[in-house]
Amino acid sequence: SWEWWHDARLYGVDFRSGYNMDSYKYYIDFASKFGIPYIIMDEGWAKSTRDPYTPNPTINLAELIQYGKERNVKIVLWLTWLAVENNFDLFKTFADWGVAGVKIDFMDRSDQWMVNYYERVAKEAAKHKLFVDFHGSFKPAGLERKYPNVLSYEGVLGMEQGGNCRPANSIYLPFMRNAVGPMDFTPGSMLSAQPEDNRSTRANAMGSGTRAYQMALFVVFESGLQMLADNPVYYYRERPCTEFISSVPVTWDETKVLYAKVGEAVVVARRKGDKWFIGGITNNEGRTINLDLSFLPAGQSFTLTSFEDGINADRQAMDYKQRESKVNNATQL
């Protein structure tokens, strides 16, 4: 769960929302209810972006870490790269505090010094059993293979860019950006809009594309750390959608591409254990794609729960239809 995208603007609650104790406990409670293992405390948790040791006066970090621990939810802290560089002993300190990982931001360059910085960070974080999410980063080049505690990188025009993030561009990402490594796209908008209707602001963050499209992104895009970027108030309201996206794994045992045409559409099937997840996205143009489920094990029947664009999704992007059906390896969809 991530508060920055919607500026921690909770509502319908009996406390003043923002970057404060009551709000973060609300995020922890939400994450716990849906089995989400982490919350990210983004820019605003610290008194100064230069000081990684002093929370802002509204935050008792030790209390929040303990509150989360009691509910099986761990905390990830956002930092600027320079604060990390100037306080490189913070990894030990954060580990001692019980922090799970760090989200490091604003590198915004890829010269040799910065490339070396990434590895120094990954190595030091691994030494103290912390994971790393590189935000404001260049695209990955394999560092996560040597340091598997590097879970994701931004390096993409993702949902943080509001209305500028459109399906017509994002359809290329599975073929290009995500092909070279994990991608912190931050999907999950419940306030979905067709691109021409997107009026996203920090107060009312919106995602372009239909509701079903937003849900499919969790399957199509790979990231070792996925965000539920939207307001928990919306997620509570849209429980079937939330239950699905919070159930999608972030690591996979098997992946099959069922359909792919660059710039037009892609459909992938991914397996974790004995469960299969299928996700498909387009460039926002409607199309019919026939899917062959012959990859399923022979002699077994599966219950398919699907989330599909509703009949009016082209006019109101939040329109979707949920249905269940029995399928097997002879089924054609």
Language-model regions, residue ranges each:
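Acidic/polar loop patches that form or flank catalytic/metal-binding clefts of enzymes
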Residues: 130-136, 159, 163, 227-236, ...
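Aromatic- and carboxylate-enriched substrate-binding clefts and catalytic-loop regions
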Residues: 41-210
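Carbohydrate-binding surface patches
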Residues: 262-300
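Glycan-recognition and catalytic regions of carbohydrate-active enzymes
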Residues: 230-277, 314-318
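Conserved structural scaffold segments of CAZyme catalytic domains across common CAZy folds
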Residues: 1-70
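C-terminal beta-strand-rich structural cap/linker in extracellular carbohydrate-active enzymes
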Residues: 324-333
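Long hydrophobic segments that form regular secondary structure
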Residues: 195-221, 226, 271-276, 281-287
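Solvent-exposed beta-hairpin/edge-strand motifs
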Residues: 295-311
